[in-house]
Amino acid sequence: MIELYHSEGCPFCVKVRVAFEQMGVAYISKAMPLRVTSCFKDELIKLGGKSQVPFLVDPERGLQMYESDDIIDYVKKNYIKS
């Protein structure tokens, strides 16, 4: 299952979460404070090299990505049946 690292107050994260909800996409939520100071910070840096959110991890395909529009496009192409 895909994992989404996000912050509640981040507008780009909200955009991704709303899109996932509208598309009916199931995901593991890795919520953190807006200022990434939580235990997820080290995990984010280890996975992707920076502590930016939103950050998507797709363990089935070995993919990690940043950027809300890229995340939404990727999920549409790979998880939504036309």
Predicted regions and their residues:
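GST-like domain detector, emphasizing the conserved glutathione-binding G-site
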Residues: 2-8, 14-82
